[in-house]
Amino acid sequence: MGCCFSVQFSFDDQTLVRIFNFLCGNINRNSFGVEERPTQPTIGQEEMLEKAWNRLMEDRVGIMGLHGMGGVGKTTLFKKIHNKFAKMSSRFDIVIWIVVSKGAKLSKLQEDIAEKLHLCDDLWKNKNESDKATDIHRVLKGKRFVLMLDDIWEKVDLEAIGVPYPSEVNKCKVAFTTRDQKVCGEMGDHKPMQVKCLEPEDAWELFKNKVGDNTLRSDPVIVELAREVAQKCRGLPLALSVIGETMASKTMVQEWEHAIDVLTRSAAEFSNMGNKILPILKYSYDSLGDEHIKSCFLYCALFPEDDEIYNEKLIDYWICEGFIGEDQVIKRARNKGYEMLGTLTLANLLTKVGTEHVVMHDVVREMALWIASDFGKQKENFVVRARVGLHERPEAKDWGAVRRMSLMDNHIEEITCESKCSELTTLFLQSNQLKNLSGEFIRYMQKLVVLDLSYNRDFNKLPEQISGLVSLQFLDLSNTSIKQLPVGLKKLKKLTFLNLAYTVRLCSISGISRLLSLRLLRLLGSKVHGDASVLKELQKLQNLQHLAITLSAELSLNQRLANLISILGIEGFLQKPFDLSFLASMENLSSLWVKNSYFSEIKCRESETASSYLRINPKIPCFTNLSRLGLSKCHSIKDLTWILFAPNLVYLYIEDSREVGEIINKEKATNLTSITPFLKLERLILYNLPKLESIYWSPLHFPRLLIIHVLDCPKLRKLPLNATSVPLVEEFQIRMYPPGLGNELEWEDEDTKNRFVLSIKK
C-alpha cells in the first residue's frame, strides 16, 4: 500500500525574484566574503606592500606587526594588504578587519568580531565576556581566518577575546598596525616591519598629486617653491597630503613664500597643522603616560632640525634636569635614561642613528614645540631658535616667562642685555661664535640648571656672576678658550657635571676640589693634563664617579682614581716604550685615545701580553666597557691584536701610524677561534697607514657595521667581507681614497662583489 502526492507550484516572475533575493541574502549571511576597503593610490609604498604581503603569506608567520610613526601611512598600507585577500578565493575562509584605536575595550573588540561572524543577536549580547569568547572561538577554530587589527596601542589578548592563536598547523593569521614597536614584541612578532617615511622623490610625487598640475603650472617659480615646501614635510605622508591639499588653490608666488616662512619659523601656525596633523601625532605623546618620559621627549625639541643627538649627553641633561629620579649613581641613572630613550624610539617618536645617536623627525619636533608652548598659547615657554642663522639674541615679549631657551648652532658673538630670565632652567648657547657673555644677563638666573657654552672657540672668560647660579648642575665649557675658572665657581654647591674637555688654554683647575657635589668631570684634551698636583686635587672629590683626562707622564694612579676614568687620553710618550698594562685595571674605561706615543703592545696583566693572556683566558675580556678607540702617530705599533679582548668596540680610528701592517695578527690569534671580533663595530676609519695590508685574514660577520672609511692605505686591497657579512647593506658605506682604490678592491667572490659594489661611495 502506498501513497503518492503530486503537488504543483506556479509562480509569477515577481515572486521568483523575491525568492531569489531571499536565498541570496541567506547565502550572504552565511558566507564571509572579503569586501574591498576604499583606499587612495599608494605612492612610494609599493615595495613595502610587496614585502609585507610576502611575509604574511609565509607558512611560518602567524602574527605580523607593522609599526611606524603617526601619519606615516600604516593604515593605507594595511588596507592594501586587506584588499589583496579579495583576490584569494580559497586559501582563507574569512578575513576580519577591526579598527581598534586607543582605549578600546575587550567587549568592544568582541562585539566587532561577532558582527563579522553574524553572532550578534539579542541572546549573544546578554552573555558575559567569557561566554562570548567561547562563541567566537567555536566559530573560528574550524576556519582558516585572517584577523586584521588596525591601530592598536597595547597588547590585544587574543585568548580573552576568543581568537585561536595562529600557528603553522591552523595556518591562520593575525596582522596589526601600531605606533609602538614594543607592542609588536608583546603580541609575539619579534621581527616587525617598520613603515618608514617616503624617499624624497616619492614624497615629491605625493605632494604634486595633492597640489595638482593647475597650481604647479600657474607659475614656474611655484614649482621650485613647492619642492621646498615638500622637503619640509620630510617624507611624512600625512603632512605631505594635508599641506599639499591646503596649497592646492594657491597660485601666487607670495602665498608659497609665506607658507615656507611660516613652516620655517613656527610650523604649528600653518593652516590645518594645528587641527589635522599635530593632534594626530599627539596621540603618541599622550600614550607615553609617565610625565618624566614626556619631559624627556619635549626636551629633544631644543635641538636643531635633523640634528643627530648624542645619546649620552642627552641623558646627562635629563639627569641634571631631574627627569630620571634621585639616583646619585651616574651609571644607574644613565641606565634608566637609556631605558627611557628606548621607550621613545620604540614609540617612533625618536629614530636611532647607529647606537650612539637619535634624531627627531621635523614634524614630530614641531608637535613637541607645539605641546611645550601649551598648544601655542605660551610661545615663550620654549624659545627655540637653533641653527637658524642668528647673529644676535632674539627678542621676547616676556623674558620672565621663558623656561627653556636654545640658541645653539648660530653666529651669535655676544649677549649683553639685562633681561631678567628668572624662570629659566635650561640655556643652550653651544656652537656659536660667542666672545662675551654679560654678567648682567645671567645675574637673575637663580633657577638655571643646565648651561651649555661648548664649542664657542673664542669664548675665554666666564663672568663672576656665575657664582649666583645657585641651582646650576650642568656646565659645559668644552672646546672654548677659557683660561681660568672664576673664583666664584666654588659657590656652585649643586654642580654635578662639569665639562672642560679641549679647553686648550686652561692653565689650572685649582680649587675644583671645593665642588663637593661634582660627580662627572671631563678634562680630556685640556691644557690641564693629569700631573701629580692635578691628581692630588681630584682625589679630594669624594663624590666623583666619572673622570675623562689626558695623561702625558707616567704616574702612579691609585685604584680609586683609575676606576673613575671612563675616557682616557695618552699623549706624548716618545722617550721610551710606554707600559700600558695599567689600562686593564680601569674597570670603567669606555674611550681610549693614544696620540704621539711609543708602545708596541698593550698588556692585559702586568706580566702578560695580549696574545699570551688570550691564549690562557680566551673567554675573559679585559676591556669589557671599551667602545671607542683612537690611535694617532703611534709609529712603534705593528698590529692591534689586543682589541680582541674589547668585545664591545663600536668605533675604531687609526691614523698616521706608519708601522701598522695588520689590525688582527693571524699568528697571535691562532688559538682564539672562539673569539669573533667587531660584533658591535659601527665605524672603522683607517687613514694614512702605508704598510697596512690586512684587517683580518678571513671574512667576518659585522652585524652593526655602517661604514668602512679607508684613506691613503695603498697596500690594503681586500676587506674582510663576504656576501653575508653586513646585514644592513642598504645603510652600509665603503669610502676609499684615492677614489680609484675602490675599483681595485679584491673580493671574496662574485656574490660579495655584487652585494657591496654599490656601497662604495666617492
UniProtKB/Swiss-Prot annotation:
A GO MF term: ADP binding
Domain of life from the UniProt record: Eukaryota
Gene Ontology biological process terms, A to Z: defense response
Positions annotated to bind ATP: G68, M69, G70, G71, V72, G73, K74, T75
Gene Ontology CC annotations of this record: plasma membrane
LRR repeat extents: 401-422, 423-444, 447-470, 471-493, 494-516
Nucleotide-binding recorded as keyword: yes
Subcellular location: Cell membrane
Covalent lipidation (S-palmitoyl cysteine), chain numbering: C3, C4
Annotated keywords: ATP-binding, Cell membrane, Leucine-rich repeat, Lipoprotein, Membrane, Myristate, Nucleotide-binding, Palmitate, Plant defense, Repeat
UniProt domain NB-ARC: residue ranges: 26-329
Similarity comment: Belongs to the disease resistance NB-LRR family.
Domain remark from Swiss-Prot or TrEMBL: The LRR repeats probably act as specificity determinant of pathogen recognition.
This protein's name: Probable disease resistance protein At1g61300
